[in-house]
Amino acid sequence: FADRPTDFMMDRVDASRWPDINVPGNWELQGFGTPIYVNHPYEFCSSGYSPYWDKPNPPYVPQEWNPTGTYRREFTLPGDWDDKEIFLSADGVRGAAFYYLNGKFVGMSKDAKTPARFNVSTIAKKGKNVIAIQIHRFSDANYLECQDFWRISGIERDIYLYAQPQIHLTDFKVESPLDENYRNGILKVKVQFTNESGQNSPFVVGYRLLDKNDQQIAQSSTQVSGDQTEVEFTKKTIQEPLQWTAETPNLYTLVVSLKRPNGDVIEATSCKVGFRTVEIKDKQLLVNGQPILVKGVNYHEHNENTGHYVSEELMKKDFELWKRYNVNTVRTC
């Protein structure tokens, strides 16, 4: 920690002689540092690995031994991103991470499995850009993420930039239970959005629900303007939808959009939706009114070669194995 570079984010830094590293990937699996396995102890205490501390002292961690990784990469911003809101997304970084773009501090994150997203519209520029990240292996977050698995560090999921229009979606929520008779579906949709254009021109917020043949079975829309940032649509009843269960995973497609009053699409996105009700009655777990047994596994997202980075191909193999053995529940660890 004490020997870490402190000017790593500056443009004057020559990183041409720094070693390369695969991202996503844990640095201990690529020759930098030592993987540590402990069950419930903290790896920075003598019960785990470190010779420096005899017992934990939350929220503090050792300053004399705190391995730190520093990353830099140059990239060119796409030419068609003018007048758009630009975001940096780090989908999973293990350690206390500090993010910089073009020498300016963007933000920090500590949660290893939660995406960290930052608006960098005022920092990103045309042409060459430099992203720099410094990750400290230990922080107060280690007290919350102490679990029975390999303790390794670094960038474990994708890091990327993306652009959205100045009027864009920020979030949406979908609820799709069955009615009390487990016959018809109930569709509830709430959409959140923002207008960074500086203008109060009206636009239309809406959604469409499509079946597996892309046939529309429900829709709703409303016009908004001004400083409005959320629409909660009136719930709809979907007559006798194909229900979702682990054995019959029927799904519909929900398309959420923002449009100009003339119908031009500003932004649209989609997600899969299944109609189901999960509840506990008389100490019995029910799905769509039917009792089920939980047959599950723990999933640590671990690979002997790449650490906590798991490829999409390997994930698919894991799912195929689970289904082969009738697994219907997965606990992510």
Where are these regions (language model features)?
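Accessory beta-strand-rich segments of carbohydrate-active enzymes
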Residues: 1-4, 18, 26-29, 34, ...
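Exposed aromatic-hydrophobic patches
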Residues: 116-122, 229-239
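Short, solvent-exposed loop/linker segments at the N-terminal edge
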Residues: 176-185
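Short glycine/proline/serine/threonine-rich loop/turn segments at secondary-structure transition edges
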Residues: 81-85, 124-128, 237-251
